[in-house]
Amino acid sequence: MGLLTFRDVAIEFSREEWEHLDSDQKLLYGDVMLENYGNLVSLGLAVSKPDLITFLEQRKEPWNVKSAETVAIQPDIFSHDTQGLLRKKLIEASFQKVILDGYGSCGPQNLNLRKEWESEGKIILW
C-alpha cells in the first residue's frame, strides 16, 4: 500500500452529473475538496497542486479538469519520529476543524479567534 494521494480522496463528476447539483451542493463539493487537499499538504503528502484545486480556488466548474492526480513523496525512511509528526499534524488539523465548525460561523465575535490562529501560523480551512 502506497502513500495517500489526492486522487484517493477526490470525487470526480461528469459534466452531466455536475449539472444536476444545486449551487449549495457545488459549493460544499468545492469546500470539501479544498479541505482534503489542505489536509494532504499539511501532512506533507502533496507536492504539486492538482488542476482541480486550481479550478476550485478560482471558483470555476471542475467537470472539465483532466486529472485530480497529485504526486506524493515517498520518504526514503519512514521513521517512528516521522510517523509521530504526521499523526500530530493530523490531530492538529482535525482539532482546528472541530473548533472552526463550532465557532466559525458565529459572527464577528470570533474574528479574534481567527486572527489569533493565523498569527500563530495555523492554517485556517473553511
From Swiss-Prot:
Gene Ontology terms: biological process: regulation of DNA-templated transcription
Encoding gene per record: KRBOX5
Domain KRAB: 4-75
Pfam families hit by this protein: KRAB
Organism, scientific name: Homo sapiens (Human)
Domain of life: Eukaryota
InterPro entries registered for this protein in UniProt: KRAB, KRAB_dom_sf, Krueppel_C2H2_ZnF
Protein known as: KRAB domain-containing protein 5
PANTHER family the UniProt entry points to: KRAB DOMAIN C2H2 ZINC FINGER, KRAB DOMAIN-CONTAINING PROTEIN 5
